Amino acid sequence: MNKVFPQGENGYTAAESKAHPGGEAGGGHLCCSRRGACLSASLLLLLATVAALIALVTILGLPSCTPGAQACITLTNRTGFLCHDQRSCIPASGVCDGVRTCTHGEDEDESLCRDVPQSLPHFLVAHCGDPASWIYSDQKCDGTNNCGDCSDELSPVTVCPPCGPGWWRCPSTFFKYCDCIPRHLCRDHVQHCSDWSDEYACPGP
């Protein structure tokens, strides 16, 4: 007498199901599930790594790779140095002056100050008529003889604007100034202009 096995909904008998426990019907789903779990774990690990790197850059305030990204314009409309907080703009002459002005001290960083002016970004440096002399870029066209030969004020390459309202134009007798003197020096009974115009023509401040 033949033994009859009950049939399931899919037409397979119970014996056939037991005879193939690792067949395609069950084993394929298990393999796919394991592969999906591995992919999910790898993706989560990658996302966690990226998030950690972003947090590190944000916390430590790592510097920009390009020196040009550190340039800015100060409140006095002069070239400045942008601190790593991306908010503080300090004067060019405040870089490598021995005083840490930026929060993280990047304005006094060894990479900037190890061989001044060669180690400074180009936007912080202005060259004088004497090739051996240089000044900070914010000292150009400020009315003061910073180069010593007035090339930072009178050179055709410099192209400085005319004397401002707080200045009097004349050939100065003082080494500190070039072709303009501050108006507060007018009519102080001291000759500041070679033509004495500071005492007789300048209306004063």
From Swiss-Prot:
Organism per entry: Homo sapiens
Cellular localisation: Membrane
Record keywords, A-Z: Disulfide bond, Lipoprotein, Membrane, Receptor, Repeat, Transmembrane, Transmembrane helix
Annotated TM spans: 43-63
GO terms under cellular component: membrane
Gene3D superfamilies membership: Low-density Lipoprotein Receptor
LDL-receptor class A domain residues: 71-114, 115-161, 162-203
Domain of life: Eukaryota
UniProt family annotation: Belongs to the LDLR family.
Coiled-coil region(s): none
An individual GO BP term: vesicle-mediated transport
Keyword Disulfide bond: yes
Stated name of the protein: Low-density lipoprotein receptor class A domain-containing protein 1
Protein topology in the membrane: Single-pass membrane protein
